[in-house]
Amino acid sequence: MTQTHTTKFSKILVAIDGSEISMKASVYAIDIANRKGNEAGSVQLIGLTVIDLTKLNSSFFATASGYYGEKELEEKRKEAQQWLEKAEKLAVEENNNDNNDVNNIQFKSEIIEDPISKVGSAIVDYAERENVDLIVIGTRGRTGFKKMLLGSVASDVVTYAHCPVLVVK
């Protein structure tokens, strides 16, 4: 006899860094959200972007007149917001194309600024704090080496996450 085990994913996090692979991961997350939403009501889909402050070209430090590097950081925030808006647009389009009259996906955007270059940890910590049921992440991000099977961020998330992780290549 085989037992069927159904998993309820009511809160799904997708890590988005603007790379082609992260947008592909968004499509997978949206598809899962639609399927689970059809089975069990609405699903919250969280698009999360982590800005690694150590990767800014200019140093970011406090001065008497404000923060040096603030302009570059603001540009990164705008770029991150554009990525999240693109993912949200995909979710809305998919939700509208669904045959049901029910809006199954509630999309939420989050941007985290990471001061210590621990992007994987920032994703895992956020997922745990928000009680996420599933994390969807691309194999490699914008800076990943082509020959690596799994990037360092994805590897950290897979290793330390409290919940299931779907890695998309």
Residue ranges of predicted features:
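A short acidic, glycine-rich active-site loop
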Residues: G66-Q82
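Active-site-adjacent beta-strand anchor residues
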Residues: A15-I16, I112, G138
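Structural beta-alpha unit
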Residues: M1-Q3, T7, K89-I135
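Small/aliphatic-rich secondary-structure junction motif
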Residues: T4-G69, D98-N100
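General small-molecule cofactor/ligand-binding pocket signal
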Residues: I46-L48, K108-I112, L166
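Gly/Ser-rich helix-loop-strand patches that form or flank binding pockets
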Residues: M1-T4, K8, Y126-K169
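Short, solvent-exposed amphipathic alpha-helices that sit
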Residues: Y28, K78-L90, A122
